Amino acid sequence: MQTFHKDNLFSLKQSRGLRVSFSARSAFTLVEILVVISILAILTVITITSINFALSSDLTRGASRQVQSYLAGARDRAIYAKEPRGVRFILDPANPTAVTSMIYIAPSPNWEQGIIRLERTDADSNSVADSASVFYVRGDGTDWASLASRDLIKQGSRIKIPGDDSGTWYVIDVDGSGVSGGTELLRLTVPYRDPGTSDPTEVIAFTPGSGPSTYLLELPPVILSGEEPTLLPNNTGIDLDRSFLPASWRPPIDSTHVSRGGDSQPGKAGVDDDSSGGADDNGELLWPGTDDYRLYSSQLDLMFSPRGSVLGSEAGSGKIHFVLDTLENIQSSWLRTTDYAEGDRVQLPARLAYAFTPYDRVYVCKTGGTSAGNPAVFLITGTRNEGDIVADGSVRWETQLNATPSLLTLFTRTGSVNAYPMYFDFAGNVPPDVFKYAETGEAAK
């Protein structure tokens, strides 16, 4: 048995004192708990934001890889089959400015029914030609009206005259043509190569027994047998308004090719958007900050030749830049005189000088309120630095880099498809050179 000693008594007192001291600090104070909760809340918000951003970026990169693979597949099919093959981009039913699925296509047989004759312009129908140039092709038994009613004669369609090996292909001016009812008249975008054999004042360009009577009319491609549409990853799409598209894909700004949106008026209903002295005129169609939107064709087709290059008018620009983004971002264009809440996110409207190109900044609402009427506040060089605050009516926006979209570039002369990051230009450069990496071949540092 251990001998009791006064030192033992001292040690016992010390240990009891320590236990008392420890037991007195066994819980947090209310202030400490509130501080911890606040820190955890801040960390949670930061973490969730980072996760959402990472997930969005992963989604668009996955969509970019899928489109890249699909285009490469169409090119390979054309080379292997030694016949043109292509891809049809299918619009999203709920968002007509986004593509959310694709399908493989092949060319249709050329249409050659009936016979034709060539005519000069006679705008006032007085049987005297307005000029010696031969612009019109009149059909007899061609059934072009039936084709037009099925949307098979489209802007950019071509006709070969005559229809044999000596013929030349011409682009059809669909808007200037008359193909309805009993009228079967196509207008060429350029005059026919031969001025005709009749007097230049005659409407019919060739005398009987001379001139071409055969033709080949190019029809839109058809879906390959057995193919089903391939969907892009959920919540992603090709942003047509912000992609650098072929001219033949870009709808003209008129009442036929622009939807007036929910208010059924050009621009913002009841507002003189363009300061022209009147509200709701056609000059305000597709005005920045309004709910108007472009009406794209239901047949956005890219065809590859057996050599691997892109065929048709779509090849004219040399390159096509596809912008893949989340559907939320695609639909988040800034609107004038609209209420916004904290956390809302907007993009610069893809209108006027900023049509068919992405913008390298986005804006997150930090103070809710009502927006003003001019998107130019987002273009001031002093508000393009990351973290800058943009004053827009009673709304305050924070500038952030637009890092969610992915870029995919198709080089039409070679058929190669490459993915590139979007270039975040310097704050002082407006408009920004967002396609710098894609067009110079540089990689992001």
For the regions a language model picked out, list residue spans one by one:
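Conserved polar catalytic motif of the HATPase_c/GHKL fold
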Residues: 73
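N-terminal secretory signal peptides that target proteins for export/translocation
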Residues: 1-23
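N-terminal single-pass transmembrane signal-anchor helix
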Residues: 23-52, 70
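Residue-level "contact hotspot" at macromolecular interaction interfaces
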Residues: 23, 149-152, 339
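Tryptophan-rich substrate-binding surfaces of secreted polymer-degrading and adhesive proteins
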Residues: 332-400
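N-terminal helix-rich module
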Residues: 2-10, 28, 46-49, 53-68, ...
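A cross-taxa feature marking solvent-exposed loop/turn segments within ectodomains of secreted
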Residues: 41, 80-82, 358
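Exposed loop/turn and edge beta-strand positions of beta-sandwich/beta-sheet ligand-binding modules
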Residues: 33, 298, 359
